[in-house]
């Protein structure tokens, strides 16, 4: 039996689900459901969780942010973020440093793919970069 695919999920995919953003909600929710069901091994970059916490508590409350992140951690792994991650990201020729950190995090957790809606932000890509709908079509 082939091993299940490993993906690093960009924060915008989570926000599509949490904020029910159309027309992206359906495919992003299907991706998270596949991770929750164990069909895919999903990772988030560590810094995405701090940003997510901030955005949730700004609109709702700290308690709600804690509850949502606690739930996510039941089925999503956290990609390590250390000095090596930062140093490698600094050496990527990306306009946005946060995107470089995401890409290096994906490489370090041995992801098969980085799933995002902003494919153009991850060039040059060190591994495949796909939208949720496109990745789901590969399953």
Q: Where are the model-predicted features located?
A:
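Acidic, PIN/NYN-like endoribonuclease modules and their adjacent C-terminal/linker elements
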Residues: 1-6, 30, 75, 107-139
């Amino acid at each position: 039996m082939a091993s299940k695919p490993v993906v690093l999920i960009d924060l915008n995919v989570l926000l599509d689900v949490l904020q029910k953003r159309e027309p992206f909600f359906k495919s992003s929710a299907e991706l998270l459901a596949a991770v929750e069901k164990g069909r895919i091994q999903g990772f988030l970059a560590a810094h995405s969780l701090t940003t997510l916490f901030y955005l949730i508590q700004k609109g709702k409350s700290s308690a709600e942010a804690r509850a949502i992140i606690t739930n996510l951690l039941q089925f999503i792994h956290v990609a390590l973020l250390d000095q090596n991650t930062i140093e490698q990201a600094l050496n990527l020729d990306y306009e946005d440093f946060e995107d470089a950190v995401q890409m290096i995090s994906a490489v370090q957790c041995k992801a098969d793919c980085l799933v995002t809606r902003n494919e153009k932000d991850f060039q040059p890509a060190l591994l495949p970069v796909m939208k949720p709908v496109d990745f789901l079509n590969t399953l």
